[in-house]
């Protein structure tokens, strides 16, 4: 069975790809550039990870309309990337409004064309930034939309294998599957060394700390988040 993997190049999408690969799916990898600050590094990570898993069927999409819409510090350079607040309950400025719905729509379109029956996305509801489009209920609803909006003979379902996992569990799962974490990129701010202090870096570093392992990528700072 063929599956589309939404592969940003980050830690979660890497482990999701490793899981789909281990389950024996024929993988097709999709990457979206949406005008984010670190798009060069994320695209590089996507290509390296796709090479690692020998994924030949790939789609790189330009969706910079999200940068034109704005509203996120990832795409609007007038908004600073805020430092990590792992105890806060508010949605951080890095949230890109309704981004995942757009990504999923593109993935469903491609899946329908190439005959893929599954779409894997590395969304995490637990132990994450609290983005509303990373909740299980959102993906359950989107599966209903797919059933209504595709051809009757189409059978496409979204798979979210990480949705209820803690970040440290994701690290351990990746290690179990020998996922190449050194090829992935999570930093929202930098394309040289990861900053170590943005929300995404903090969640990643804390996950590795809790898993009792050292993150293999380079950081400008490595604060202790435990």
UniProtKB/Swiss-Prot annotation:
Keyword set, alphabetical order: ATP-binding, Ligase, Metal-binding, Nucleotide-binding, Queuosine biosynthesis, Zinc
Cofactor requirement: Zn(2+)
Entry binding sites for ATP: 7-17
Entry's Gene Ontology molecular function annotations: ATP binding; ligase activity, forming carbon-nitrogen bonds; zinc ion binding
Reactions that this protein is recorded to catalyse: 7-carboxy-7-deazaguanine + NH4(+) + ATP = 7-cyano-7-deazaguanine + ADP + phosphate + H2O + H(+)
InterPro entries documented for this protein: QueC (IPR018317), Rossmann-like_a/b/a_fold (IPR014729)
EC number(s) given by UniProt: 6.3.4.20
Disulfide linkage: none
GO biological process terms, semicolon-separated: queuosine biosynthetic process
A Pfam family the protein falls into: QueC
Residues noted as binding Zn(2+) in the record, renumbered to the chain: 187, 195, 198, 201
Family of the protein in this entry: Belongs to the QueC family.
UniProt-recorded name of the protein: 7-cyano-7-deazaguanine synthase
């Amino acid at each position: 069975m063929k599956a589309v993997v939404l592969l940003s190049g980050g830690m979660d999408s890497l482990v999701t790809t490793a899981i789909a690969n281990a389950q024996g799916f024929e993988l097709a990898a999709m990457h979206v550039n949406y005008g984010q600050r670190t798009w060069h590094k994320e695209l590089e990570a996507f290509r390296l990870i796709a090479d690692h898993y020998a994924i030949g069927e790939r789609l790189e999409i330009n969706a910079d309309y999200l940068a034109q819409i704005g509203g996120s510090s990832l795409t609007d350079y007038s908004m600073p990337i805020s430092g990590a607040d792992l105890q806060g309950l508010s949605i951080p400025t890095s949230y890109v409004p309704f981004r995942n719905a757009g990504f999923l729509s593109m993935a469903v379109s491609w899946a329908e064309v190439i005959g893929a029956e599954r779409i894997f996305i590395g969304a995490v509801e637990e132990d994450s930034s609290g983005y509303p489009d990373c909740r299980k209920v959102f993906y359950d609803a989107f599966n209903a939309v797919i059933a209504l909006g595709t051809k009757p003979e189409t059978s496409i379902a979204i798979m979210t294998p990480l949705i209820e996992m803690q970040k440290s569990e994701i690290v351990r799962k990746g290690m179990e599957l020998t996922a190449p974490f050194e090829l992935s990129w999570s930093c929202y701010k930098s394309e040289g060394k990861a900053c170590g202090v943005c929300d995404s870096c903090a969640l990643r570093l804390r996950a590795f700390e809790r898993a009792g392992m050292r993150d293999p990528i380079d950081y400008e700072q490595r604060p202790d988040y435990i």
